[in-house]
Amino acid sequence: MLDFALGTEWIVDAYGCDPSSLRSCTALDRLFARIVGELGLHPAGQPVWHVFPGQGGITGLLLLTESHLACHTYPESGLVTINLHCCRARPAWPWQERLVEALGAAQVTVRALPRGRS
């Protein structure tokens, strides 16, 4: 049994996003780069993007030495879901502000879950 956290997992949902941004690997790549840079994270490679056909969304994954950063976009609903797991403590990041800037989000919910605590 652990009595301390082994990291934090952020679960982020952003609603009312611009559908064209949610279909853009460029926009999502810039967002990932900003998250990584501002939080001092360390990529273990390049992001991998899967673009769904037609008007579908994008699934993205970036392996980090600290764990991972992932997103799933739903342009038809104006929604992006983001998951960031870090095995070390990180400062709070302005998810609301950054997702409004990057994707035009109207509403952002953020949950920070300590991992490994019993």
Model-identified regions with their sequence ranges:
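Polybasic/polar functional segments that serve as interface/processing modules
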Residues: M1-S118
